[in-house]
Amino acid sequence: VEFIKMTIHIKATGFDFTPALHKEVEDVMNSLAKFVQRWDEEGSVLLRVEIARTTKHHHKGNVFYAEANLDIPKKVLRVEETNTDMHAAINILKDRLKNEIVRYKEKMTDH
């Protein structure tokens, strides 16, 4: 089985974004590649992920904001998550994006 990878641009601000974290984000997000494989074969898929440490006045400590924009033909799917745990934020982001992809595919097959 060939492992599918998509083009992913990752931007991180406000914290130390180590190579290990970069790889984690890539690995988690690449698990979605099978859902966009048909579009990716056309070379028309780009996933942009942004992760930032933010300060929310009603939270103590670190709060991470994660956002993903998936450029697919004729559409941009966008999801976001705010969480005190960066790893949880990344995984929730992936799950939300997967749901958006599935919803979009269902819409496309209905027409």
PLM features: what roles do these ranges have?
Residues 2-111:
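N-terminal, polar/charged subdomain of small-to-medium soluble alpha/beta proteins
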